[in-house]
């Protein structure tokens, strides 16, 4: 029964659909006139539309003409004319909605029109995909449309250098993955200079597979971390040995459903005996508990060849949803090290957080957000609640005629797979293409062996064979094809009956050495013929496969999420083609075993049928739906929890990152530094004068404290004399006199160094202190969050406590930033060198045609017209980055994975450090507050 909120959402959906139909009709009336334009005239439309928008005309008003232009542009470049429903989907995206469009409806092409329209503003459009392959493929293919229409397109890939990334972001339309966009945001906020910044704002984003990215992956935050101090690695090896002496149920408990472990009293005693300690839970031994829990999890919850594989002595994570190896990715919180110790391979060092953000809060940065997927309505309320995104179900271009058969349920997996193989064999004999979905690499390989025994030629698509995955998927609809895939979510390439003509044409041109960006003219000249030949080759076979019933999708197990089941089914029956789907299940499948074991046991107990006979039961369907509902509910709760806690940190992050960005972009900090000086002096005086009367205040301690900040030029006696005696001294008098003295001292410092030098010194010092203090604050917030759950035992709300203590810690950090900045500005010994001439090399890395349009025609000249003075002060040199950084992000299932990036270039303010020896001239070093 739909809730009231869901009914309201559906009402809004119907109103939006009416508006989209109006837009589609308006675009259709323009189609004939746009077809009469020459290529040059069509490109001129872009300049006209851009000028009209600059003159104040809204993008909504320009939509019909812009979409009509793109429809004609895509017809001429790709040979693809957008259907009315594709235009409706594009309009829904422009209006800031999620367009729910079934698999095969051409979502990649849909994105071109709203991207073009919003690209006219010159602020940049980001098209977000799930992996580098799709980003690159879509950028090359759809980028041809944008370039034909006079826009620029770019692509962000994980291996690119910062200079290349900056160029790609300067384009009108930029493709990339959610993780790369998020990590670039974090990197920008660790930057030491404006030259390191790559992103230029967050204007409009179109998120492909939006449910996967904004829902499934939103449980895990993006984290950039660097090597932590201390040698913890030896403990992983020790505890890997310890857990081999422990027995499940006797020494520890395991909950596979919640993926948690708990150590029992006998187990604790064994661990204490092995380590030679009296109490594992003493405060000094507390860190060891984490090593023990991770070692047990590695032993019981992480299975080789299912969750990870060992290749060349490395533990490589396997994506449980896509079945692909996630090269360079690592589990966080010590879990990867525990698995390495279990497998006796090299254990690599742990890290500490340098920057972090959740996907929810990253995507909330965009002025306008939209998305596409085939399966979004089940999460409509979460999209609205978290992102303020409505879901609009776009009609299919042709009616769906796929037949979804009822599930067949067997008592155990062995007989289930026997039935699966028999079904595949019968379909294969007829020539009908079969797509088989499995939930793990292990099961795909087991099924592959069974098919090989029968001599059935097939392709396996899993973590150990990802290099050819796009070509395998592209041919999965051909006559007689059998494809065994470990989860089809996020594969991207369309399965077309008879073969994928578009993919085949792209492959053919690549074989000829043609590239749409490197050799655009030759590519465009060859495309029409290559695409036509590919279409001819596939059309005849398409008709044969249609006669055979289309693509048969066979699922060997239900996934945890209903959406992923629907995505597998949705591979069949695209664009009105026939198709069929069926799931083969067993009562011992993981989903039933973990989440509805009681129902499974009751069914097995009741049934008197032989093992090899299938059950078709509504009770089974209800049990499966209940199990999937439990998983989805658990994951939704995790996402809510992650967001609640990150919202606390997000307000702090926005304040700090906003300050850093303004500093990097050249804001004058003189006024801010004066406020720092006032606040720091006032805080010191308030601390001294909080209790008692003037005669009893500790002036010696106050003057000692102020002496660490600046060369104080008056004494307590001077102040008393000014007001006629010590009895007349008040807190306000002290503030007035000391602040006046401090500002005179700063004015003298500026006169000595020069205004330009002091402005650059302010920028460098404040940036450095903010970077270091923010990094320390992240560590402390992590530490706070880890232990905050224990507050519930004292009948206190952990979230409220986290908010309260996090605010206190943030205020303490801001005070420390003010105090240390003032101390460094007064006390650092600075040598000023003559500024070098503007570097030609810098300009060489910034192609003028693209960047000048983004930054203004004279941007390059302004940037280099007046070079900043070169300051030589200990600790102010651009800091060294760690030799390697780790980037932790969600995989397709939402679990954390980490990739390592080794670096040799200079680094970021997040890593900056002013050594104690550099913090003084002839004065004591600035006082540092101790923060817990």
UniProtKB/Swiss-Prot annotation:
Keyword terms: ATP-binding, Cell membrane, Cytoplasm, Membrane, Nucleotide-binding, Protein transport, Translocase, Translocation, Transport
> What the protein does?
Part of the Sec protein translocase complex. Interacts with the SecYEG preprotein conducting channel. Has a central role in coupling the hydrolysis of ATP to the transfer of proteins into and across the cell membrane, serving as an ATP-driven molecular motor driving the stepwise translocation of polypeptide chains across the membrane.
Q: Which GO terms describe its molecular function?
A: ATP binding; protein-exporting ATPase activity
Q: How does it assemble?
A: Monomer and homodimer. Part of the essential Sec protein translocation apparatus which comprises SecA, SecYEG and auxiliary proteins SecDF. Other proteins may also be involved.
**A GO biological process this protein is involved in?**
protein transport by the Sec complex
In which organism is this protein found? Renibacterium salmoninarum (strain ATCC 33209 / DSM 20767 / JCM 11484 / NBRC 15589 / NCIMB 2235)
In terms of SMART domains, this protein maps to: SecA_DEAD, SecA_PP_bind
Q: Which residues bind ATP?
A: 86, 104-108, 494
User: For bias kind Basic residues, which ranges apply?
Assistant: 920-932
Reaction(s) catalysed (UniProt annotation)? ATP + H2O + cellular proteinSide 1 = ADP + phosphate + cellular proteinSide 2
What is the name attached to this protein's record?
Protein translocase subunit SecA
- The main location class comes to membrane
Q: How does it sit in the membrane?
A: Peripheral membrane protein
